[in-house]
């Protein structure tokens, strides 16, 4: 009977040691390396600086494309109103050409006076 009690204590002790060892093992992987080995490694804290200044000051050799000329947004409120009225007229003329219904909301009165003579032509 004492032999079974002694072996159970031994088994419990081994099990406890195994659990303790498995819990401590992952922490040992993060220990720092000795200084002699770490000093041999060259560390660049900012990363690779190989092509840092390669494109600094470079100018484009191609002229700006003509499609970008004149696409700047209108600057003044008058220019914006003119652009909006042109866009609205173009949309309405497309709807008329496609035979679409004008069942949407009516344009504001200020634009209606501009559009009525153009649509009656």
Curated annotation (Swiss-Prot):
* Propeptide segment residues: 60-121
* Annotated protein name in UniProt: Neuromedin-B
Name the major location: secreted
Q: Where in the cell is it found?
A: Secreted; Cell projection, Neuron projection
The organism named in the record is: Mus musculus
What are the entry keywords? Amidation, Cell projection, Cleavage on pair of basic residues, Immunity, Innate immunity, Secreted, Signal
Name a single GO biological process.
Answer: antiviral innate immune response
Q: What induces it?
A: Up-regulated in lung tissue in response to infection with influenza A virus.
Tissue-wise expression: In the hindbrain, expressed in the medulla surrounding the lateral half of the facial nucleus. Also expressed in the olfactory bulb and hippocampus. Detected in a subset of neurons distributed throughout the retrotrapezoid nucleus/parafacial respiratory group (RTN/pFRG). Within the RTN/pFRG, expressed in neuronal subpopulations distinct from those expressing Grp. Expressed in lung.
Q: Give the PANTHER family listed for this entry.
A: GASTRIN-RELEASING PEPTIDE (PTHR16866), NEUROMEDIN-B (PTHR16866:SF3)
Q: What happens when the gene is disrupted?
A: Significant reduction in the sneezing response to capsaicin at both low and high doses but does not affect pain-related nose wiping behavior or apnea induced by capsaicin. Abolishes the sneezing response to histamine, seratonin and the neuropeptide Npff. Abolishes sneezing response to mast cell-dependent allergy.
Whichever gene encodes this chain, its name is: Nmb
